[in-house]
Amino acid sequence: MPIPQQWLQFAPKPRDLANGEKWNVFLSYRSINRNWVLNLYDVLKELDYKVFLDQYEIIGGDELIQRLQDGLTNSQSGILIWSTAASDSVWVDKEYQTMETRATRDPRFKFVPVKLDGKPLPIFAANRVFEDFSSYPDGPNGGELLRLIYAITGEHMSKDAIDFANKQSQLAADMINELNAAKITGDAESIVQLYHSNILPWKTTASLGCTAGENLIKLRKYNEAIELLQGVENDFPKAIRPRQLHALALARRGQNDDLNQAQRILAKLYAAGERDPETLGIFARTWMDRYNKSGDTADLRQSRNYYEDGYKRAPDDNYTGINAASKSVLLDEYEKGAAIAKKILENIGTQAVPGDYWTTVTIAEALLDQKQYADAGNMYQQGIDMAPMEYGSHESTWGQAQLLMEKLKPTPDERALIAKPFMHLLKRAAQNA
């Protein structure tokens, strides 16, 4: 489904590429914000913008000058995505100053910084206005998205466009709040009903559909998630994120031919050059599923290698990092796994992150990889308490912990420390039997 004309009539078209220009816009970000950026990437592609996404072009460790050579230098505009979680001062300062210099020297180049949360900006960035997307944690939408597109083209918004943008901002914010409220209360039916409400923010970008699908996956409503995400894919055929989530839902459900279908989706993305940590991470997960069925160590090693590739490409990506660590432990490469786990804890710390289930249980798993059973059990409990209705997330976390304990051989008392936070899963399974 193309973006509705009601929205397109206000959206500026991409500028023509002049001599030497290859891209309409260059996106610069840290991998921790990759899902948000993928949604921006998808909508820009849908609007026929040529987009340079450095995560797809660059392997971690490359020098900035090298990656800018064919990216930023040959782009009409640059968007720098900033959040507190990605506030690596060296990276932010380098990328910001590079784009600022380019904008100063070339009036045709449009530099648009974007912030994803309400925290204060770094001091060096105080002189430039940032586009504020703090109300859109899962991807751009609403009037802010329209304003961003105007900013990268350098066009001015008409009064009608401004009024339209303000209305869309309110509609999108209302939908996001409704979706997250339904996730908190475990109300999958309301999530599906919201998707079928068919108001304009659902038709503009895939971000709301992805949020709905991901919430259903977290609630272990895999059938509903798959059906919804297939609809999002049909509406936004160029979008990457719905396909990733569709594959994840299939892998989590694990019925009949689900694993093969998930691998086909991800292998196609991989073959098309999509090597971002999310694609690699979910693909790696399906190889682990194959190992659980086959017992073939080659499948386990393939899983670990894809996770490790994702982590090398994005060293701040804790999801691929912790899985590279844990799969190394399962391969009897304990020292390697413990070293990666230690590095992750140096990056994110050893304290629970309020409201962030996955970061908190990542800390727990890194502690488990290092045989710190009491601390790991305590951290798992804090993660469960943050998201008590996310049974799908709990099952995935517990499954990994069980595999690790089989390899690490804790004492019965140590095993009980890890199992205690997950007792509700056993009770729930007994009730559903």
Q: Where do the language-model regions lie?
A:
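Amphipathic helical hotspot of TIR/SEFIR-family domains
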Residues: 69-70, 74, 80-119
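C-terminal interaction surface of TIR/SEFIR-family domains
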Residues: 1-46, 110, 115-193
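Alpha-helical linker/edge segments of TPR/alpha-solenoid repeat scaffolds
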Residues: 253-258, 290-296, 329-340, 369-373, ...
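Alpha-helical junction/boundary sensor with strong preference for TPR arrays
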Residues: 198-203, 229, 236-237, 266, ...
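Amphipathic alpha-helical repeat scaffolds of TPR domains
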Residues: 167-182, 201-214, 236-253, 274-293, ...
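TPR/TPR-like (Sel1-like) alpha-helical repeat modules
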Residues: 311, 325, 342-343, 373-390
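Conserved BB-loop
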Residues: 39-70, 84-92, 132-136
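Helix-turn-helix repeat elements of alpha-solenoid scaffolds
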Residues: 179-193, 214-228, 251-265, 295-304, ...
